[in-house]
């Protein structure tokens, strides 16, 4: 399964200028939270669950109208108390009451409990981009820094999951603390106290 995010600046190959760590994490398959769990204890903090309109660069990927109501879930993934990822997940409202209804009951459990344990779920290719001020994801990521100064740009990735033909898109924005950890410690196994995905 594929979707074309190029018109909105998303691309399958990370842009030139990304570090090796960034290229690695933007293209890793599987559950992002499972990868984070290799770095330390993972905590999922839900910051918003609501009915909303899609962002400007989301309708095409979801094959939906720009005004179609969506169910939105936003979380911060922290490792040992430090925010590493801001995640934004979105599904058509009708699908969130149907094939994706379990996403409404997750609370602080990771979304990956739904995405990676069900053989009926298919995933698109990962796409990525730099995120600068003016994109709603930049505001979401900046807020996750708890007052720390935001960088000029973040890097983020997204993919679309489908179950019975109904889409759920997950966008994951990596925060500066993740890159600092990798610079200092690499990403080898440490305590694994959590599993799952954004």
From Swiss-Prot:
Removes the pyruvyl group from chorismate, with concomitant aromatization of the ring, to provide 4-hydroxybenzoate (4HB) for the ubiquinone pathway. It is found in: Cytoplasm. GO terms for cellular component: cytosol. InterPro entries: Chorismate--pyruvate_lyase, Chorismate_lyase_/UTRA_dom_sf. This is Probable chorismate pyruvate-lyase. Coiled coil: none annotated. Substrate binds at residues 73, 111, 172. The keyword Acetylation does not apply. Belongs to the UbiC family. Pathway: Cofactor biosynthesis; ubiquinone biosynthesis. Its main location: cytoplasm. It comes from the Bacteria. Its EC number is 4.1.3.40. It is an enzyme of class 4 (lyase). The lineage of its organism: Bacteria, Pseudomonadati, Pseudomonadota, Betaproteobacteria, Burkholderiales. Pfam families: Chor_lyase (PF04345). Keywords: Cytoplasm, Lyase, Pyruvate, Ubiquinone biosynthesis. It catalyses: chorismate = 4-hydroxybenzoate + pyruvate. GO terms for molecular function: chorismate lyase activity. The gene is ubiC. PANTHER family: CHORISMATE PYRUVATE-LYASE. One of its GO terms (biological process) is ubiquinone biosynthetic process.
């Amino acid at each position: 399964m594929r979707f074309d995010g190029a018109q909105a600046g998303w691309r399958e190959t990370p842009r030139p200028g990304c570090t090796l760590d960034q290229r690695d994490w933007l293209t890793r398959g599987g559950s992002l939270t499972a990868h984070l769990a290799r770095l330390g204890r993972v905590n999922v903090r839900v910051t918003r669950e609501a009915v909303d309109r899609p962002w400007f660069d989301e309708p095409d990927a979801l094959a939906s109208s720009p005004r179609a109501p969506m169910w939105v879930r936003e979380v911060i993934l922290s490792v040992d108390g430090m925010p590493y990822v801001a995640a934004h997940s979105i599904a058509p409202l009708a699908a969130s009451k149907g094939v994706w209804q379990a996403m409404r009951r997750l609370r602080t459990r990771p979304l990956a409990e739904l995405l990676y344990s069900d053989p009926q779920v298919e995933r698109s290719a990962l796409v990525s981009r730099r995120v600068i001020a003016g994109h709603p994801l930049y505001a979401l990521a900046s807020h996750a820094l708890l007052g720390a100064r935001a960088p000029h740009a973040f890097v983020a990735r997204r993919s679309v999951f489908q179950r019975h033909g109904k889409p759920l898109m997950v966008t994951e924005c990596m925060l500066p603390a993740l890159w600092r950890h990798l610079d200092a410690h690499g990403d080898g196994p440490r305590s694994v106290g959590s599993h799952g995905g954004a």
